[in-house]
């Protein structure tokens, strides 16, 4: 997987036909060039279905026969999800598929005509020229268990977003119709609070039934004792509520629908997380990853889902760059800019690593010692957040070795980064 630009350029020979494809939802556009940038044939438009893809291959094959080319390299932008089917079709036919960064396409499209114009004729050439110059990457399309795991993680992210929207709707509803509710219940997702919202959500309903009926409703589903003081506090809050009273009938219908959606999403989320755990445990090295104190199943599964098969990587810095944790600096002349992380890469991977490092710091002694060392050392002490990012990169290296070499986690090796003055002086 590790190719520098020279290696990428060397893969393109005089026998290679480079095709740049501008991907769209229904109609793709393509142009063909050789390794010097000379165009062959006419631009083609083809549909995003089997007939269109076969037509594309026939067009490319005709050009290759006429120009004495032996290899086809197809470059494209990863536009949304529209490129996936076409890329799979080409890979099934044993043709090389590469991707160019949409940001690079945007920046380089003015080279030929000094114009920011974007159209279906111009973009395929821009893409092909980037490929010709070795400015491409080979797509990391997961297969087998890694593909299943990534899709499962995608589903979990979708459900989590939907659940957050539902939670916000409940919070909005309470702010409008019963703003005092949160003074009685610290969390509306608690059992007693949910029963209240289902059975008697409005102040008028609460005042109409009294404390005994409220307690009886709670005790039906809650085994532990629920205090009468809480019921009296709820009645008092309802009696003093400043919530909106107009349209209250449909407000009750609204909260009922919202809570039904909430319960459905919670159930679906538990189900998909159980499936994620099942899939993750099939990945070689999963148990070794979980042996690190503080590493949870879900965050570890997200790491694997984003990175894919570890054998595709030659160095942990590739994963660090994939996560957007590689360091960048903006300096010129005597001006020395501030060093920051690039944040270019897989957002979910970067987020998972950062979320993972917090419980690790709370539970793992080796990481705690490293964190203390990085933030208190005499030379170049780091701020706490900077140290956490450094530890995220350290965690990447630990995972890389565990998965690549099939070894167990060794906390003592972690501490080799700490420079101990007493040891140096003794030497």
Predicted feature descriptions by range:
Residues 1-427:
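A detector of single, family-specific signature residues
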């Amino acid at each position: 997987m590790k190719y520098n630009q020279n290696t990428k350029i060397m893969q393109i020979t005089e026998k290679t036909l480079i095709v740049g494809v501008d991907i769209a939802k229904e109609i793709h556009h393509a142009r063909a060039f050789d390794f010097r940038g000379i165009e062959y044939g006419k631009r083609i438009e083809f549909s995003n279905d089997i007939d269109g893809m076969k037509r594309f291959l026939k067009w490319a094959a005709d050009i290759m026969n006429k120009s004495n080319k032996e290899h086809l390299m197809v470059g494209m932008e990863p536009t949304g999800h529209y490129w996936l089917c076409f890329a799979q079709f080409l890979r099934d036919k044993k043709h090389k598929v590469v991707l160019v960064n949409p940001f690079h396409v945007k920046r380089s499209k003015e080279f030929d005509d000094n114009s920011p114009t974007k159209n279906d004729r111009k973009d395929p050439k821009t893409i092909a020229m980037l490929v010709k110059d070795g400015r491409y990457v080979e797509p990391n399309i997961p297969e087998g268990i890694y593909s299943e795991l990534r899709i499962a993680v995608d589903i979990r992210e979708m459900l989590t977003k939907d659940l957050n929207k539902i939670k916000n709707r409940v919070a909005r509803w309470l702010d409008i119709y019963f703003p005092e509710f949160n003074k009685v219940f610290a969390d509306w997702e608690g059992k007693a609070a949910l029963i209240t919202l289902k059975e008697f959500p409005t102040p008028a309903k609460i005042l109409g039934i009294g404390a005994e009926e409220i307690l009886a409703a709670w005790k039906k589903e809650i085994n532990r004792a629920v205090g009468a003081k809480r019921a009296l506090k709820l009645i008092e809050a309802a009696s003093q509520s400043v919530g909106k009273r107009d349209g209250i009938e449909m407000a009750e219908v609204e909260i009922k629908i919202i809570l039904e959606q909430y319960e459905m999403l919670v159930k679906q989320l538990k189900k998909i997380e159980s499936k994620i755990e099942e899939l993750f445990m099939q990945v070689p090295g999963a148990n070794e990853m979980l042996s690190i104190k503080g590493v949870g199943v879900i965050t570890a599964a997200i790491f694997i889902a984003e990175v894919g098969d570890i054998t595709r990587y030659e160095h942990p810095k590739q994963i660090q760059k994939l996560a957007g944790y590689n360091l960048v600096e903006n300096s010129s002349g005597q001006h020395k800019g501030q060093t920051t992380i690039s944040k270019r890469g897989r957002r979910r991977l970067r987020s998972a690593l950062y979320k993972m490092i917090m419980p690790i710091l709370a539970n793992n002694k080796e990481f705690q010692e490293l964190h203390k060392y990085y933030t208190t050392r005499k030379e170049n002490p780091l701020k706490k957040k900077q140290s956490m990012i450094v530890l995220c990169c350290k965690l990447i290296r630990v995972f890389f070795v565990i998965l690549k070499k099939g070894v167990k986690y060794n906390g003592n090796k972690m501490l080799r980064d700490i420079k101990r003055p007493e040891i140096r002086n003794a030497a």
